[in-house]
Amino acid sequence: MSQTHRILLLNGPNLNMLGAREPKHYGSISLTSIEEKIQTLATQHNVKVECFQANSEEKLINKIHESFQQVDFILINPAAYTHTSVALRDALLAVSIPFVEIHLSNVHKREPFRHHSYFSDVAEGVICGLGAKGYEFAFLFAMDYLAKK
């Protein structure tokens, strides 16, 4: 890659509690550990990654808006907002930044209300059920996607 690409890693509500929160579904790794792994990959690929987590829909939307023409790709785990937030979906569509939707657990093996996503049909891809590795796979996909641009 001739230029340094910029990636935004967004994590939604309650993901700051990873490691302690329902390890049966989400694993025992912390969000900090996931972010550190992505930063290591970013260094290896000469890419800048900004990590941001919020429990507030407003803060996530504002971060997406701030990314307009500043970020080349978004990796997002919308968490519970996956199933409820038209506003986050609209923010992503407004900035026209390609993104991958990530979920630690396999949402299709869980409660029926978790089966619907407001993001999947407008995402470049969706990764779910692969635990923390899903973030790494999403990052590598973003690298491939950006290399082809």
Curated annotation (Swiss-Prot):
Q: Which residues bind substrate?
A: 77, 83, 90, 104-105, 114
EC number(s) on record? 4.2.1.10
Q: Name one GO biological process term.
A: chorismate biosynthetic process
User: What's one GO MF term for it?
Assistant: 3-dehydroquinate dehydratase activity
Keyword Isomerase recorded: no
Domain of life from the UniProt record: Bacteria
Reaction equations catalysed: 3-dehydroquinate = 3-dehydroshikimate + H2O
Q: Which residue positions does UniProt flag as site: Transition state stabilizer?
A: 21
* Protein family (similarity comment): Belongs to the type-II 3-dehydroquinase family.
- Name recorded for this polypeptide: 3-dehydroquinate dehydratase
Species this protein is from: Haemophilus influenzae (strain PittEE)
Gene symbol of the encoding locus: aroQ
